[in-house]
C-alpha cells in the first residue's frame, strides 16, 4: 500500500507558481487515471485557458490510437512523439496541458514542463487509479497478466519524477473532478492576486 502521509490533501498555491499559472501555462502530470484530462478540461473552463491533451494531440497527428502506436513503434517511438508534441506546445501561451502519464520519464520533458509553466501533479492512490483504469483497454502498459501490479510498479517508478517536476502536488483521489478543478482555479486566482 502506498502511503499518502507526505501529500497535503488541500490545494496550496503560493508565490511564483501561482503567478506563472495565472499568466501562463499549466501542465498537469500524474499517473494514468489520476484525472488529468477531466480536471484539465474543467480547469481550462474556469480559468479561460485553452485545453490540450498530449495523447489526443499525438492521435490527431498520427491518425491512429495510442495502442496502435505502441504496437508499431513501441514505447520508445511513442515517447519520441510525446517529446515532439510537448516541445511544440511549449510555444503556446495561456494553455492547460494534460500530459501522458509517462511524459516525466524523459529528463528533457521534465525540464520543459518545469520551466514552461506551472506543473501540477494530480496524485491518486493505487486503489483509485486501479478503479479508474481496470476496464480501459486503451492503456497499453496495463495489457499484462497482472495489470494492477504493473500499475503499482509504474507508480513507484514515476511518483518521484512527478514530485521532482511539480510545483504543486494535489491529492486527486477523493474529490470530484469538478470540485478539484474549482478549488485549484480559486487558489491559482487568489495566489496570482496576492503574489
UniProtKB/Swiss-Prot annotation:
Cofactor note: Binds 1 Mg(2+) ion per subunit.
Subunit structure comment from the entry: Monomer.
Residues annotated as binding substrate: 55, 79, 101, 158
Pathway: Metabolic intermediate biosynthesis; chorismate biosynthesis; chorismate from D-erythrose 4-phosphate and phosphoenolpyruvate: step 5/7
Protein purpose: Catalyzes the specific phosphorylation of the 3-hydroxyl group of shikimic acid using ATP as a cosubstrate.
GO cellular component, one term: cytosol
Assigned EC number: 2.7.1.71
Keyword hit for Zinc-finger: no
Family as reported in the entry's similarity comment: Belongs to the shikimate kinase family.
UniProt-recorded Gene Ontology molecular function terms: ATP binding; magnesium ion binding; shikimate kinase activity
UniProt name for this protein: Shikimate kinase
Amino acid at each position: 500500500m502506498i502511503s499518502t502521509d507526505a501529500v497535503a490533501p488541500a490545494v496550496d498555491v503560493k508565490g511564483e507558481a501561482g503567478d506563472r499559472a495565472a499568466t501562463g501555462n499549466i501542465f498537469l502530470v500524474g499517473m494514468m487515471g489520476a484525472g488529468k484530462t477531466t480536471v484539465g478540461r474543467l480547469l481550462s473552463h474556469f480559468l479561460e485557458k485553452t485545453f490540450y491533451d498530449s495523447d489526443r494531440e499525438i492521435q490527431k497527428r498520427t491518425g491512429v490510437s495510442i495502442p496502435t502506436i505502441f504496437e508499431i513503434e513501441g514505447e520508445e517511438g511513442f515517447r519520441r512523439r510525446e517529446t515532439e508534441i510537448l516541445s511544440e506546445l511549449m510555444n503556446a501561451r495561456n494553455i492547460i496541458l494534460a500530459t501522458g502519464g509517462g511524459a516525466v520519464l524523459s529528463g528533457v520533458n521534465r525540464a520543459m514542463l518545469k520551466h514552461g509553466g506551472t506543473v501540477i501533479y494530480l496524485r491518486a492512490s493505487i486503489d483509485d487509479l486501479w478503479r479508474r483504469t481496470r476496464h480501459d483497454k486503451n492503456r497499453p502498459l496495463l495489457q499484462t497478466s497482472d495489470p494492477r501490479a504493473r500499475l503499482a510498479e509504474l507508480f513507484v517508478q514515476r511518483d518521484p519524477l512527478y514530485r521532482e517536476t511539480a510545483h504543486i502536488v494535489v491529492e486527486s483521489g477523493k474529490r470530484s473532478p469538478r470540485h478539484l478543478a474549482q478549488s485549484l482555479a480559486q487558489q491559482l486566482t487568489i495566489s496570482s492576486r496576492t503574489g
